[in-house]
Amino acid sequence: GIFSLVKGAAKLAGKGLAKEGGKFGLELIACKIAKQC
């Protein structure tokens, strides 16, 4: 459901932020949430 999606997004955000830096990680999460990849 919604909560598992949010948890997954948070995990991806954490990894993305750590690995790629803020902007890329946030854009990836926004893309996943909006389903407009």
Swiss-Prot record:
Keyword tRNA processing: no
Example of a GO cellular component annotation carried by this entry: extracellular region
The keyword Aminoacyl-tRNA synthetase belongs to this UniProt entry's keyword annotation: no
GO biological process: defense response to bacterium; killing of cells of another organism
Cellular location(s): Secreted
Disulfide partners: C31-C37
Keyword field: Amphibian defense peptide, Antibiotic, Antimicrobial, Cytolysis, Disulfide bond, Hemolysis, Secreted
Tissue expression as described in the entry: Expressed by the skin glands.
Pfam families (UniProt xref): Antimicrobial_2
Function according to Swiss-Prot or TrEMBL: Shows antibacterial activity against representative Gram-negative and Gram-positive bacterial species, and hemolytic activity.
Family: Belongs to the frog skin active peptide (FSAP) family. Esculentin subfamily.
Protein name in UniProt: Esculentin-2B
The organism of origin for this protein: Pelophylax lessonae (Pool frog)
Lineage, opening ranks: Eukaryota, Metazoa, Chordata, Craniata, Vertebrata
